[in-house]
C-alpha cells in the first residue's frame, strides 16, 4: 500500500488548506504551541526537520527565525513550491530540500536534528508506527517532536453535526481515492499509545479547530474570525475540546536517558 503523493493536486491542496480560515486558524494555534516549544528549548539556533513539509509554510517561518531547516516531501511539486517560496522570502540559505518520503529521510541526514515537525502526514501513511520509529532515530536525545494528525473523533463529530447518519453508520468510508480527505484518520488514544510505547514523553496536547468547523453559520468563520480564534485559544488545550478538534497537535520529547534506536 502506497503513501499519498500530492503531485496531482498540489495547487488544490494549497488553495484549500492555506487559502481559508481553517488553514489560518490551524497555523495560528499550531504556532502558539511551537512558540512555547522554542522558548523552552532556549535561544540557540536549532536544526529542524520538517518531515512531509509540503510547500513549506511552517518550515519557512522557522527559517525566518534563523533556524536551519531541512524539508523533505514525497511530492516533487511540493518541493518545487517550497523552494520558490523560500527564495521569495529570502531564506534559501537556511533551508535544505530533500525529495523523499518521511520514512526514508534517515539515509539523507548525517547528524540528528533538534526538532521535528510532522504535521498532517500521519493520516496519509500506511505504516504510522514505522514512520514514528524513523523520526525517533533522527532526533537527538532531549529533542522534541511536533506531531499534528487528523482526528477520527473530529471527523465523526463533523459528520454527525452535518446529519450524515448513513455515512457514519457505514463507518465513514473514503468516497474518492484522489481527494484531500485523509486515508487514515487517527484515533488519538491510539496515537498517544504509540508514542508512549516507543519511549516518547508527551509534553502537551492541543485540539486544532475545536469549534470552527462545527459553526452553524459558516460565514462566522470569516466574519467573526478574531473572536473565534480567541475562544479556540481559550478552550483548545482542555478536554473535552482537545478530542473534538479536527486535528490534534501533540508535542513529545525524546528522553535524554534513552539510547537512539
Curated annotation (Swiss-Prot):
It catalyses: 5-carboxymethoxyuridine(34) in tRNA + S-adenosyl-L-methionine = 5-methoxycarbonylmethoxyuridine(34) in tRNA + S-adenosyl-L-homocysteine. Keywords: Methyltransferase, S-adenosyl-L-methionine, Transferase, tRNA processing. InterPro entries: Cmo5U_methylTrfase (IPR033664), Methyltranfer_dom (IPR025714), SAM-dependent_MTases_sf (IPR029063). It holds the Pfam family Methyltransf_31. S-adenosyl-L-methionine binds at residues 26, 52-53, 73, 102-103, 119. Changing residue 209 to A: Lack of activity. Induction: Expression is positively regulated by H-NS. Changing residue 213 to A: Lack of activity. Changing residue 247 to A: Decrease in activity. Its EC number is 2.1.1.-. GO terms for molecular function: methyltransferase activity; tRNA (5-carboxymethoxyuridine(34)-5-O)-methyltransferase activity. The keyword Calcium does not apply. One of its GO terms (biological process) is tRNA methylation. The keyword Ligase does not apply. Changing residue 73 to A: Lack of activity. It is an enzyme of class 2 (transferase). Catalyzes the methylation of 5-carboxymethoxyuridine (cmo5U) to form 5-methoxycarbonylmethoxyuridine (mcmo5U) at position 34 in tRNAs. Four tRNAs (tRNA(Ala1), tRNA(Ser1), tRNA(Pro3) and tRNA(Thr4)) are fully modified with mcmo5U in stationary-phase E.coli. Also present at low frequency in tRNA(Leu3) and tRNA(Val1). Belongs to the class I-like SAM-binding methyltransferase superfamily. CmoM family. This is tRNA 5-carboxymethoxyuridine methyltransferase. The gene is cmoM.
Amino acid at each position: 500500500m502506497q503513501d499519498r503523493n500530492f503531485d496531482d493536486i498540489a495547487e488544490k491542496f494549497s488553495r484549500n488548506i492555506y487559502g481559508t480560515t481553517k488553514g489560518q486558524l490551524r497555523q495560528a494555534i499550531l504556532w502558539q504551541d511551537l512558540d512555547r516549544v522554542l522558548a523552552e528549548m532556549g535561544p540557540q539556533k536549532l536544526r529542524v526537520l520538517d518531515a512531509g513539509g509540503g510547500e513549506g509554510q511552517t518550515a519557512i517561518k522557522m527559517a525566518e527565525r534563523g533556524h536551519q531547516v531541512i524539508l523533505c516531501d514525497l511530492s516533487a511539486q511540493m518541493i518545487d513550491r517550497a523552494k520558490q517560496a523560500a527564495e521569495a522570502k529570502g531564506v534559501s540559505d537556511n533551508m535544505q530540500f530533500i525529495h523523499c518520503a518521511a520514512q526514508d529521510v534517515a539515509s539523507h541526514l548525517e547528524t540528528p536534528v533538534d526538532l521535528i515537525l510532522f504535521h498532517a502526514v500521519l493520516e496519509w501513511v500506511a505504516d504510522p508506527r514505522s514512520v514514528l520509529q524513523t523520526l525517533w532515530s533522527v532526533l537527538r536525545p532531549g529533542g522534541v517532536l511536533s506531531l499534528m494528525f487528523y482526528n477520527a473523533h473530529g471527523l465523526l463529530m463533523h459528520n454527525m453535526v452535518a446529519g450524515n447518519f448513513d455515512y457514519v453508520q457505514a463507518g465513514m468510508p473514503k468516497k474518492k481515492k484522489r481527494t484531500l480527505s485523509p486515508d487514515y484518520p487517527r484515533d488519538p488514544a491510539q496515537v498517544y499509545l504509540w508514542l508512549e510505547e516507543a519511549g516518547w514523553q508527551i509534553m502537551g496536547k492541543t485540539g486544532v479547530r475545536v469549534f470552527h468547523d462545527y459553526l452553524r453559520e459558516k460565514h462566522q468563520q470569516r466574519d467573526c474570525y478574531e473572536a473565534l480564534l480567541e475562544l479556540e485559544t481559550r478552550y483548545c488545550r482542555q478536554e473535552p475540546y482537545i478530542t473534538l478538534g479536527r486535528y490534534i497537535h501533540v508535542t513529545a520529547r525524546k528522553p535524554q536517558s534513552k539510547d537512539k534506536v
